[in-house]
Regions:
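Short beta-strand->loop
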Residues: 39-41, 91-94, 113-117, 137, ...
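Soluble non-cytosolic domains of exported or imported proteins
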Residues: 16-20, 73-77, 96-99, 117-124, ...
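Proline-aspartate-enriched helix->loop->beta-strand connector
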Residues: 79-82, 86-92, 110
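Bacterial Sec-exported substrate-binding components of ABC uptake systems
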Residues: 1-27, 139-169
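A short, structured surface patch at a secondary-structure boundary
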Residues: 26-78
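A conserved mid-domain beta-alpha-beta active-site/ligand-binding segment of alpha/beta enzyme cores
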Residues: 167, 174-175
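Charged, glycine-enriched surface loops/patches
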Residues: 102-138
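Extracytoplasmic/periplasmic mature domains of Sec-exported, cell-envelope-associated bacterial proteins
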Residues: 1-2, 6-9, 15, 20, ...
Length: 175
């Protein structure tokens, strides 16, 4: 059972066909070594001709998929295309999914939207929620630990960063 902003989603068995919607959610699933049967087109950053961020496309290729199923949901979810992927689960812990969208997507497959506040899920929670939803909680916890250690080890190489913080923003002409 996954608790979230719109209640809870019951996942009866480990999903095999996973759809990821909105930003970055495919990355969590791919990091677990799973391949989404469909994912959202990216609308920020330097995207590839397939509509993915370069590292996302590279991970798809590493996992044997040269032409992933990418949904153009920039103006709203493409429910027909999502249903056409025949998912066992829809994952979107980092999203701005509205309740009416959640209800409609839940008619297609069990859906896991953001837990508390739209677009506020940290990378850690995004990975942990996605890994729990697909029955790989331990693997997700291990990935978080490995990533935190990677960050810590690399920041330690630059002592002048001690006590500093940073903000990253992406702004384009549409903003």
């Amino acid at each position: 059972v996954m608790k979230h902003a719109y209640g809870e989603t019951i996942i009866k068995e480990k999903p095999k066909k996973i759809v990821t919607l909105n930003w970055n959610n495919a990355d969590s699933i791919l990091a677990l070594g799973l391949v989404p049967v469909g994912t959202s087109k990216m609308n920020w950053g330097s995207v590839t001709s397939k509509g993915l961020l370069p590292w996302t496309e590279a991970k798809f290729k590493e996992l044997g998929v040269d032409n992933p199923n990418v949904f153009n949901d920039l103006d709203g979810y493409d429910y027909e295309a999502i249903a056409g992927a025949n998912p066992d689960i829809i994952i979107a812990p980092y999203s701005g999914m509205e309740e009416k969208e959640y209800k409609r997507l839940s008619e297609i497959a069990p859906t896991v939207p953001f837990k508390d506040v739209a677009w506020k899920t940290t990378w850690r929670d995004q990975l942990l929620e996605a890994s729990e939803a697909v029955g790989m909680k331990d693997e997700g916890e291990k990935l978080v630990e490995e990533t935190e250690n990677f960050i810590k080890d690399n920041v330690a190489k630059y002592p002048n960063l001690s006590g500093k913080s940073a903000a990253l923003c992406y702004i384009d002409a549409a903003d």
